[in-house]
């Protein structure tokens, strides 16, 4: 029997803020549209910034989460995990100093700059969700940097797409874009006790998407 779910929240792992694309957008001389927004007073949506930093993987995550989130009234259905600010609504605008702050912290479960805000937000979110709700992690479950913090608060409510097993980031991004475009939701399994590694699935056939 299929598990009845009242609400579904997506947690998106962050883009790396210390790489070449981050340095590109952080440059004072950067003049492309997203950079001008980030450098301006109003900033740019964190989803747009992380999509620029990560490319296909984050683009797939945000498209998929927006397509299938079922949040409770008055709450966000798509939250981005950050290196220093806990969970942030994917629509939140960030500025230059925010991205620089993210770049200073490499996510690790033992780093209090990362762990303390995440634990606080996870506890708060857990109290607002019913036992039938699901929190779906769109990110790696192979290390403890997300799982160790989240499982303690969400337990069996913490899930991930079963089709992620055996796929790399690019394949996951392509799969999620395809599912969002086709309105075909993936199946989710509990993170607790999940098989982390598996046989690599066949490559996805190429497909073009509107930008």
Language model features by range: what are they?
Residues 1-211:
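Peripheral peptide segments
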